[in-house]
Curated annotation (Swiss-Prot):
Major role in the synthesis of nucleoside triphosphates other than ATP. The ATP gamma phosphate is transferred to the NDP beta phosphate via a ping-pong mechanism, using a phosphorylated active-site intermediate. Keywords: ATP-binding, Cytoplasm, Kinase, Magnesium, Metal-binding, Nucleotide metabolism, Nucleotide-binding, Phosphoprotein, Transferase. GO terms for cellular component: cytoplasm. The lineage of its organism: Bacteria, Pseudomonadati, Pseudomonadota, Gammaproteobacteria, Enterobacterales. Disulfide bonds: none annotated. The keyword Aminoacyl-tRNA synthetase does not apply. This is Nucleoside diphosphate kinase. It is an enzyme of class 2 (transferase). InterPro entries: NDK-like_dom, NDK-like_dom_sf, Nucleoside_diP_kinase, Nucleoside_diP_kinase_AS. It is found in: Cytoplasm. GO terms for molecular function: ATP binding; metal ion binding; nucleoside diphosphate kinase activity. Homotetramer. HAMAP family: NDP_kinase. Pfam families: NDK.
């Protein structure tokens, strides 16, 4: 297995619930190293830029509204097969379909307010990490 990096967001609803520490504990318990992290409040322009690939879809405006509704945590996780393992830990996008014990089963409120985001491919991970972090902000451990 290769060591990979993946990008992760703890979304506004999970930040508001004060479960950042619980989610970070789950990341570390699953064998991920958190190699970069910061809290920020997205502007509309930042959210639209990040979700550019979804522009024109029916859920786009609601997604942007939600992602700008409060602070988020963005982080880079590192570990073996990190992209797929992080997606498995998150659970299904729709929390109604998420397996028990996944982050979305435990912390999501709805399809849109689904608590967390994670990269779905190496290309997405590279783009998403670069959107929020410079190489100097990532500290391999």
């Amino acid at each position: 297995m290769a060591i990979q990096r993946t990008f992760s967001i703890i979304k506004p609803n999970a930040v508001k619930k004060n479960v950042i520490g619980a989610i970070y504990n789950r990341f570390e318990s699953a064998g991920f190293s958190i190699v970069a992290a910061k809290m920020l409040h997205l502007t509309r322009e930042q959210a639209e830029g990040f979700y550019e690939e979804h522009k024109g879809r029916p859920f786009f405006d609601g997604l942007v509204e939600f992602m700008t509704s409060g602070p988020i945590m963005v982080q880079v996780l590192e570990g073996e097969n990190a992209i797929q393992r992080h997606r498995d830990l998150m659970g299904a996008t729709n929390p109604d379909n998420a397996l028990a014990g996944t982050l979305r089963a435990d912390y999501a409120d709805s399809f849109t307010e689904n608590a967390v985001h994670g990269s779905d491919s190496e290309a997405s991970a590279a783009r998403e990490i670069a959107y929020f972090f410079t190489e100097n902000e990532i500290c391999p451990r």
